[in-house]
């Protein structure tokens, strides 16, 4: 998905609620229980536009920009992103948060929760890395080939219509920036090293798994393994859906998460 730091957003309500202060860039709206949303490796704030608008009337929704391309290259890893999240939470004074993470963002949520369980009320993982991921970021054998990148981006979705020209153009630009590509490779390798399988059984936190049945990047068996290893996990499937459920089926995603949060926290 598009880089939050490198693409000019034009997302109406989201853009109007985006702030920059003390070195952090984030979107925030609403009041009530706090939902903190974590984007993925190619993730953009705009990926969560529908979630932001849907939940902000009843929840405080906060979406920080993760510093994917601004950390020192050799220190660009999942642990550093978890530490960044901790610093952001401290800065905002956030407690008892409900983390929502897509892809790499889910992995960051897992690592953060394993280290700061007292700060986390619940987790929602959608197409999360942490166990296995067949990622675009793993290698760039043909990164200068536009058609190759176009096909890779299309694999993110069940319906390739979602792989818009803007999305492909931005991904192509990111992977052909040497400094960005280097950091993506470091993050992809870090995600493999930081396998969470041994930690998951200890994470006694209510967890909602929302997964696309047609996800080829973190396939359905990954969701099933998460459900088996996490003590308090509920798994929900979205049909005809790939690696970005909140983009491909935003209404179904929001409805599923809303019902789960209502059942868990009586809202």
Show which residues each predicted segment covers.
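Conserved alpha/beta-hydrolase catalytic His-Asp/Glu region
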Residues: 143-202
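Conserved HGGG/HGGXW glycine-rich cap/lid loop of the alpha/beta-hydrolase fold
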Residues: 25-71
